[in-house]
Amino acid sequence: MIRIYLSRLLGERRWTQADLARRTGIRPATINDYYNEFAERVNLEHMDKICEVLGCELSELIGREVKK
C-alpha cells in the first residue's frame, strides 16, 4: 500500500493544510486529499513542489507499506 505522510510532516512543522496550500499554490482541496490519503493518484509536480517547500525528500513524503 502506498502511503502519503503529509499529515506527519505538517505536524512536525506545526503547519496547517492552508499554510501548505498558500506556499505551494496547490488547491486546498487537493492538499486535503493528500493529507487524508484520499488521493487515488498523485501529481508528480505537486509532490515535487511539496517536497521543495517542506525541505524534504520524496521518500519522506511517500512510502510503501507492506500489508501483513
What are these regions (language model features)?
Residues 26-41:
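Recognition helix of helix-turn-helix/homeodomain-like DNA-binding domains
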Residues 10, 21, 51:
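The alpha-helix within a helix-turn-helix
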Residues 8, 33, 52, 62-68:
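Short, charged recognition helix plus adjacent turn
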Residues 45-60:
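DNA major-groove recognition helix of helix-turn-helix/homeodomain DNA-binding modules
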Residues 11, 25, 36, 66:
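Residue-level detection of the helix-turn-helix DNA-binding "recognition helix"
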